[in-house]
Each structure stands twice: as C-alpha cells, then as structure tokens.
A protein has these predicted regions:
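N-terminal signal peptide c-region/cleavage motif recognized by signal peptidases
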Residues: 14-18
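Non-transmembrane domains of secretory- and envelope-associated proteins
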Residues: 22-24, 146, 156-160, 167-172, ...
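An acidic-aromatic
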Residues: 48-133
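A structural detector for short beta-strand units
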Residues: 46-51, 91-96, 170-174, 193-197
Length: 228
C-alpha cells in the first residue's frame, strides 16, 4: 500500500499545470481516508481515519479527528509516565505557512497541553514525517499529476472532472474540482483488487475565527525541546 501512496506523490513532482488558478479559494473541509490491503494470509486489513483541513491564503491547517475518549486515555497514560516527554505529532494540529520568500514554516498546535511547537527545522522534518511539498500540501495532490492522466467523460459535480492513469498493475483516479482547486476524490488501487486507497473531501463552512488566531495563550516550544 505504501507503493500506492508514493505513486500519487511521485507522479506529479515537477510539472506545471496550466489550468491551475493563480489564487486558490479559501476552504474548510473534512477529509476521510480509507486504506485497505489483503495480505498473503487472505486477511483484509483496513485503516480508516479523518481529519479537519483548512486552507486560507498561504496557510494550511490540518488536524486528525481522534475520538475524545481515546485522546483522553492516551494523554492520561503519556502524561503520567515519569521522565522526559516526547512530542506526539499525530495528536496535534499541523500548521504550514508559505512566506513571501517561498520558504515553508512548519508548526504544531497541541490543544490538549496548550502548547505551540513553532520551530521545526528542516533537518528534523523526518521526526514528524513531514514532506516539504507545498503544492501537495496546499492542493492535497500536486495538480501537475493531472497532465499525466486521461480526462474521462464521466458524470461529475459542476466544474469538476474525473482523471485516470493506469501504470503497471495499478490504477489512479482523481476527481478534480477546478472551482475549488483541489481533488474531491482520490482513488488508487491495484488491478487485482487486493490493495486500495481512497481519499474523499467534504467541504465545510469556513470557521468564524481561524484556529491560528486562538493560540495567544499557548506555551511556545521548539521541537528540539522534546528530544532526550
């Protein structure tokens, strides 16, 4: 399955996409991911998760939706463990900004502990599994990928189109919205049906107050403050 996910990222790394709008509209969304693989033992294993996602200007905020009882239990165990505390980036909201100079700033907001990790240096991106691909962060997939794909004449929402690419033993499909400048659906699957991945975007109203405007009371930290 990792090969499927990597193919989506690699196919569109450096190309340009002429239909891409100069300004991407501000959006709020809920994203659902589904990852399924059938192993050699015949057992199908499926992972399903969701996240809140927000794009405003050159800022993108994403936060995995974790049921409160599970989050409470995790933090109770983690915080009660003696010794140095490590940063669990999966439990925090990720905040990525592109500055005027074209540089990315990566931050994490931990609402449970009221902490803002405002400095994640590039050499530590691997610690939080972060890939500094702004096109992919801003648009969920690199729009250049569409140039490698075939446009399909299938039913789709207004100002949206299905695209498909078959390569080797797998197929990738993207439902791209030119209006919203992002994919509404991404599907990738092996042709034998034993591996599949799906991402589905549901648009939501923009919040009245942006999440990064609510961090004044947060303690400011550097990611390296969590290192042993």
């Amino acid at each position: 399955m990792m090969r499927l996910l990597l193919s989506i990222w690699l196919l569109g790394c450096t190309l340009s996409f002429p239909l891409l709008a100069d300004e991407a509209p501000d959006l709020a969304a809920r994203i659902r991911y589904q990852d399924r693989i059938t192993g050699n033992d015949g057992i199908a294993r499926e992972s399903v998760w969701q996240e809140k996602w927000l794009r405003v200007g050159n800022q993108v905020w994403s936060q995995r939706l974790i049921p409160l009882p599970l989050a409470r239990a995790y933090h109770a165990t983690h915080d009660a463990t003696p010794g140095h505390k490590h940063f669990t980036h999966q439990m925090a909201a990720r905040w990525v900004t592109l500055d005027d100079g074209g540089d990315l700033q990566l931050r994490y907001a931990d609402a449970w502990h009221n902490q803002l990790v405002e400095e994640v240096p590039p050499e530590e991106y691997g610690q939080v599994a972060f890939k500094p691909d702004w096109e992919r962060i801003r648009y969920l997939v690199n729009p250049a990928l569409l140039q490698e794909m075939t446009r399909l004449d299938e039913q789709a929402p207004e100002q949206a189109r299905w695209y498909e690419k078959r390569e080797g033993k797998q197929r990738t499909r993207i439902l791209w919205s030119s209006r919203w400048q992002l994919p509404l659906v991404v599907e990738s699957a092996s042709l034998d049906g034993y591996r599949s991945y799906r991402m589905e975007v549901t648009l939501k109203p923009l919040p009245r107050q942006l999440p990064w405007q609510q961090l004044d009371s947060y303690q400011t930290l550097d990611l390296r403050d969590f290192f042993d």
